[in-house]
């Protein structure tokens, strides 16, 4: 699922390690070093924030949200789920699973599977079936009317299409004329 949103109050503790997002975070350099920093096995996009948040939580450090904290980030076109980072998401999902014994980025992986980009492999990982094409990019691209791209909206649309497809396959066959 998507990350939890900010708290109702100005400051709130988040008990879910997935709240960590390196787009905007603060801690002392000493604490960062004591925690071990970011795991260098994560290459490219995907999973590195979740891993760092999990590491912080595993060491007993609390995560806090600060509502209204300002972060300036250079605009760039992006996609959610990030189909344009398919290869690194797949590789990093495996790094996370090997390290923590459980998967991460399941919502993205589910969407990639529904798009026909990947399938599960017998070892519990994922096999890439194809690179994303323009229709995948169009589906996941941030739209002008949206403040951000949303994996949840894309996944809802894909799940709905899958349900309609499965419902159609279960419909009784028409009798021959």
Go through each PLM region and give its residues.
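A short, conserved alpha-helix in the catalytic core of glycosyltransferases
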Residues: 19-27, 31-36, 41-69
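Charged, low-complexity, helix/coiled-coil-prone segments
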Residues: 1-4, 25-42, 108, 124-136
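Short, flexible, basic/aromatic active-site loop/helix in glycosyltransferases
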Residues: 1-18
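Residue-level signal for well-ordered alpha-helical scaffold segments within enzymatic catalytic domains
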Residues: 30, 34, 55, 95-99, ...
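A short, structure-level motif marking secondary-structure boundaries and short turns
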Residues: 13-15, 36-39, 78
